[in-house]
C-alpha cells in the first residue's frame, strides 16, 4: 500500500552523530559482534537502515540481497558461477526488532536452505521460484530486541502487516567483510 512503509537510510551514521553513547551501547552488543565475527571474521563493516511498516503494508516479493541480489537476472547471469557461490559469504544480513512482531505484523519470511541453490541470484525473479517460496517459507514472531541474522542468499521477504495497530519497526543491518 502506498505510504505504508518508511525508512531511515544510513541510520547507523545518523545515530552515531546524534547520540554517540546510545550508538555505542547499541552496536557494541556482544550478540551482534558474535554473529558478525562468526560469519565474516574480524574487521567487518556495517550499514543500517531503520524500516517501519505501517498496518496494511504489503509483503515483499521473495528475493536475495547483496552483492548480486540487486542486479537484473541478465546481469547476474554474466557473472561466473564462483562469484554466485562466493558473493553471499562476503555479507551477513541482520534485523533487530524495535517492537514486538507477531506474525500478523509481517516479520521476515525465509525459505530454509535456499541459500544452497547456486543459480538463485539469476533465478529468484522467476514465477516458479516465487510460488515455491510462498508455499514453503517459514516466519518467526520476534520480540522487541530480538535479532535475526541470515545469509543474503536465503530467499526472503517481509511479510504483510495485516494488523490494525502494529507499526512494525526493525533496524536492518548489512555487514560486510
Label each PLM-derived region with a short phrase.
Residues 47-48, 90, 104-106, 167-169:
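Residues that flank catalytic or metal-binding motifs in active/ligand-binding sites
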Residues 37, 80-84:
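Catalytic micro-motifs at enzyme active sites that drive phosphoryl/nucleotidyl and oxygen chemistry
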Residues 62-67, 110-113, 164-167:
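Short secondary-structure boundary/capping segments
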Residues 48-50, 94-96, 171-175:
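A structural signal for short, well-ordered beta-strand segments
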Residues 1-74:
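Non-heme Fe(II)-dependent double-stranded beta-helix
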Residues 74-80:
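Short Pro/Gly-enriched beta-strand edge/turn motifs at strand-loop
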Residues 123-125, 154-155, 159-177:
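Non-heme Fe(II)/2-oxoglutarate
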Residues 78, 87-159:
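Double-stranded beta-helix
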Amino acid at each position: 500500500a502506498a505510504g505504508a512503509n518508511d525508512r531511515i537510510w544510513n541510520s547507523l551514521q545518523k545515530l552515531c552523530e546524534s547520540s554517540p553513547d546510545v550508538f555505542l551501547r547499541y552496536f557494541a552488543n556482544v550478540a551482534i559482534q558474535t554473529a558478525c565475527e562468526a560469519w565474516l571474521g574480524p574487521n567487518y563493516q556495517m550499514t543500517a537502515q531503520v524500516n517501519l511498516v505501517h498496518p496494511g503494508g504489503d509483503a515483499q516479493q521473495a528475493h536475495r540481497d547483496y552483492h548480486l541480489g540487486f542486479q537484473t537476472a541478465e546481469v547476474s547471469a554474466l557473472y561466473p558461477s564462483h562469484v554466485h557461490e562466493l558473493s553471499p559469504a562476503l555479507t551477513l544480513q541482520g534485523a533487530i526488532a524495535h517492537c514486538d512482531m507477531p506474525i500478523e505484523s509481517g516479520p521476515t519470511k525465509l525459505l530454509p536452505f535456499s541459500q544452497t541453490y547456486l543459480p538463485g541470484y539469476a533465478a529468484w525473479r522467476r514465477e516458479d521460484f516465487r510460488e515455491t517460496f510462498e508455499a514453503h517459507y517459514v516466519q518467526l514472531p520476534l520480540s522487541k530486541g530480538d535479532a535475526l541474522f541470515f545469509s543474503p542468499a536465503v530467499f526472503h521477504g517481509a511479510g504483510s502487516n495485516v494488523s490494525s495497530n502494529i507499526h512494525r519497526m526493525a533496524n536492518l543491518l548489512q555487514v560486510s567483510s
